[in-house]
């Protein structure tokens, strides 16, 4: 099969092609067309088809990672929204949980109040009420009030209507009926009901999640429609699948209805790309390290795979989001991070970034602030003639100027200042990794660090040295790792049902019936998407807690009829998980089941392993020698090093640091006392010395 993976970033759109029959792989980058990213997507696919002589009509699948929803929420640039809610509860999404994001600040910035997803004047209440336990109707929905509310919102020019009713997770009947009325009265509106997006208890989080879906919905839906039409107009009839935050892909129809599931589309694909590098190199315990121009994304992969964020810890742009997401930790640290001295006189790097325009001073686009990239230029780690394969000029004098200005404020030399910028940057990223490993009971010394993104390989080895991580893996195509990850996943859907139940008083009949119903729902959806029964896999789990707790842990449920005997392993696993997470457990205390979950995956074709073969010798890869500065035993030393061209380094040949490896999509810095080699599938393995 002929597969394309396309990941859209803020600066570049990355494309990878894989033919599963011939095992041919090709990559391409084009500038992202910010006004309409679908233009760049189609342009990149067509250019790669022309270059590789690929018949565009023979493409089978296009897998796509998108930032449309992410950017809409980060930039607060979504639809004009309205909300219909239960009488007395229109301010749930404003009040929240009385959290103070900055405990001691007298100038609080509370996102759901400062940047409301639905303006208060567009939040209309109607009479209706469901019971909190069994979902019994207490107050029937007043349809005349609904029609009046819809007419009001339509008159006010609202594009998207969100329906958030109290206790709708117990019985969605009222929300579903209101959706029908909206579609009758205002068919042009984008409609979201909370019981379809996140049918879980916790009203503030559920209401907010549904509101995000409505806020980003019209923009995502229009984008997907444009992309589908553009592909069709270009003669590409391939099936399109969109990357979701849970680590799987979904159909355009599903994503158009629930775009909130794509908020971490790109970073999730990056985690999968890191896992693919681990599979190729037979490593199971991995720390993924994706560093771009603005941010660094950290992910953890263990023997059991990647983790999923806890519902209580999942926030996007300051808003709580209660949908399944891969556990990713993001900090403001990247190649464009600005070095500065704060009001208290502290030397800091980030989180502010120069972005792509004007960008770092060394880009020559008018940047006037010292950045991490400028520090790398000063220390000789970014080559002025071979950046982006020689396609982009680096202005070293501009980098010297901004670092010198910072050095004057610090009363340090140019090189010492640049080294200080990198030390702060590297320690910030090391601390982020500590949060995801040591603070979670994992020892980073037992992991390999998989580095990718434009800036990840520049810093990975020195970050690994800080944490005593013994090995760094640089994928074959680190700059398009997220696009590669798109070709390694499956269709994946999650369904959830809130169901409170104590382990001392289990309703096994109801539990088994509900699990069977959720499984049937998923199987039907996957079959509708064209997945055959033998390619469907179902996993069951539950969110549990000790009685009286306000947070849950997820445990797997066996794929058997549940009763007092078959549930024992799940209960024991909860005790073990609680001890691993918090350092203690209460084995004599009853366990409360809160939510039951079912995850369904449908097999999709994937990229195939392809060993690399060429006739080069290591000396053929030597591009030049030059000077670079490294911290050796506490002293800055300028040394002459080799600059290697990565695509010409032969498999198995070892080479020692200090040296720098150049390729079009990134630069890899290998400090002193480190050794590297290329394994059979093209991944660079760096053995880290201290």
UniProtKB/Swiss-Prot annotation:
Cite the entry's keywords alphabetically: Amino-acid biosynthesis, Hydrolase, Plasmid
Q: Which Pfam families match?
A: Hydant_A_C, Hydant_A_N, Hydantoinase_A
A cellular-component GO term for this protein: cytosol
Q: Does the keyword Amino-acid biosynthesis apply?
A: yes
Could you tell me the EC number(s) of this protein? 3.5.2.-
Q: What class of enzyme is it?
A: hydrolase
Record GO terms (molecular function): 5-oxoprolinase (ATP-hydrolyzing) activity; hydrolase activity, acting on carbon-nitrogen (but not peptide) bonds
Please give a single GO biological process term from the UniProt record: glutathione metabolic process
Q: Which InterPro entries match?
A: ACX-like_C (IPR049517), ATPase_NBD (IPR043129), Hydant_A_N (IPR008040), Hydantoinase_A (IPR002821), Oxoprolinase-like (IPR045079)
**Family affiliation:** Belongs to the HyuA family.
Per UniProt, subunit arrangement is: May form a complex with HyuB.
Which PANTHER family does the entry mention?
A: 5-OXOPROLINASE RELATED, HYPOTHETICAL 5-OXOPROLINASE (EUROFUNG)-RELATED
Described purpose of this protein according to its UniProt entry: Involved in the asymmetric conversion of racemic 5-substituted hydantoins to the corresponding L-amino acids. HyuA and HyuB are both required for the conversion of D- and L-5-substituted hydantoins to corresponding N-carbamoyl-D- and N-carbamoyl-L-amino acids, respectively.
Q: What is this protein called?
A: Putative D-/L-hydantoinase subunit A
Q: Which gene encodes it?
A: hyuA
């Amino acid at each position: 099969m002929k597969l394309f993976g396309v990941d859209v970033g803020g600066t570049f759109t990355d494309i990878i092609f894989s033919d599963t029959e011939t095992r041919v792989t090709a990559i391409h980058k084009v500038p992202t067309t910010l006004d309409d990213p679908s233009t760049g997507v189609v342009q990149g696919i067509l250019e790669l088809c022309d270059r590789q002589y690929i018949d565009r009509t023979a493409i089978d699948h296009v897998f796509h990672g998108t930032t449309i929803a992410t950017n809409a929420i980060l930039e607060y640039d979504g639809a004009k929204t309205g909300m219909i809610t239960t009488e007395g509860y229109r301010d749930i999404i404003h009040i929240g949980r009385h959290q103070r994001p900055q405990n001691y600040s007298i100038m609080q910035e509370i996102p759901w109040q400062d940047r409301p997803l639905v303006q208060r004047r567009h939040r209309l209440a109607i009479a209706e009420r469901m019971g909190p336990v069994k979902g019994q109707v207490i107050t029937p929905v007043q349809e005349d009030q609904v029609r009046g509310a819809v007419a009001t919102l339509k008159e006010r020019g609202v594009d998207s209507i969100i329906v958030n009713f109290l206790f709708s997770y117990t019985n969605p009947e009222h929300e579903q009926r209101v959706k029908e009325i909206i579609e009758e009265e205002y068919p042009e509106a984008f409609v979201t009901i909370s019981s379809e997006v996140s049918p879980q208890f916790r009203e503030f989080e559920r209401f907010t999640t549904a509101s995000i879906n409505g806020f980003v919905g019209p923009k995502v839906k229009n984008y997907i429609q444009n992309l589908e039409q553009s592909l069709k107009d270009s003669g590409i009839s391939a099936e399109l699948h969109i990357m979701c935050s849970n680590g799987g892909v979904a159909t355009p129809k599903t994503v158009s209805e629930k775009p909130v599931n794509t908020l971490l589309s790109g970073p999730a694909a990056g985690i999968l790309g890191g896992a693919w590098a681990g599979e190729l190199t037979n490593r199971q315990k991995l720390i993924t390290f994706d560093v771009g121009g603005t941010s660094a994304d950290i992910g953890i992969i263990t023997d059991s795979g990647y983790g999923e964020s806890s519902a209580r810890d999942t926030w996007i742009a300051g808003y709580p989001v209660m949908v399944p997401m891969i556990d990713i930790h993001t900090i403001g640290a990247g190649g464009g991070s600005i070095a500065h001295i704060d009001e208290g006189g502290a030397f800091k790097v980030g989180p502010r970034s120069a972005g792509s325009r004007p960008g770092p001073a060394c880009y020559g686009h008018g940047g006037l602030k010292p950045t991490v990239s400028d520090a790398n230029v000063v220390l000789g780690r970014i080559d002025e003639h071979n950046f982006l394969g020689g396609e982009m000029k680096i202005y070293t004098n501009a980098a010297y100027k901004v670092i010198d200005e910072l050095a004057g404020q610090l009363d340090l030399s140019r090189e010492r200042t640049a080294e200080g910028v990198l030390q702060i940057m590297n320690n910030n990223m090391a601390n982020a990794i500590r949060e995801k490993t040591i603070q979670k009971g994992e020892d980073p010394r037992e992991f390999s660090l998989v580095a990718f993104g434009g800036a990840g390989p520049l810093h990975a080895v020195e970050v690994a040295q800080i944490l005593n991580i013994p090995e760094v893996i640089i994928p074959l195509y680190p700059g398009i790792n997220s696009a590669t990850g798109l070709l390694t996943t499956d269709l994946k859907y999650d369904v959830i049902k809130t169901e409170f139940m104590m382990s001392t008083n289990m309703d096994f009949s109801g539990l088994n019936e509900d699990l069977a119903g959720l499984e049937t729902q998923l199987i039907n959806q996957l079959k509708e998407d064209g997945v055959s029964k033998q390619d469907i896999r179902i996993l069951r789990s539950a969110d549990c807690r000790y009685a009286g707790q306000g947070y849950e842990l997820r445990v797997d449920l066996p794929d058997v009829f549940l009763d007092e005997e078959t549930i024992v392993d799940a209960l024991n696993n909860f005790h073990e998980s609680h001890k691993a997470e918090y350092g203690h457990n209460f084995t004599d205390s009853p366990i409360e089941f809160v939510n039951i979950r079912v995850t369904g995956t449908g097999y999709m074709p994937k990229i195939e392993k392809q060993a690399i073969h060429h006739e080069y010798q290591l000396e053929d890869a030597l591009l030049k020698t030059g000077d670079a500065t490294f911290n050796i035993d506490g002293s800055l030393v300028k040394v002459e090093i080799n600059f290697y061209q990565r695509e010409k380094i032969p498999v198995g040949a070892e080479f020692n640091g200090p040296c720098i490896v150049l390729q079009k999509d990134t630069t890899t810095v290998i400090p002193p006392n480190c050794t590297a080699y290329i394994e059979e599938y093209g991944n660079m393995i760096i053995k880290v010395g201290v």
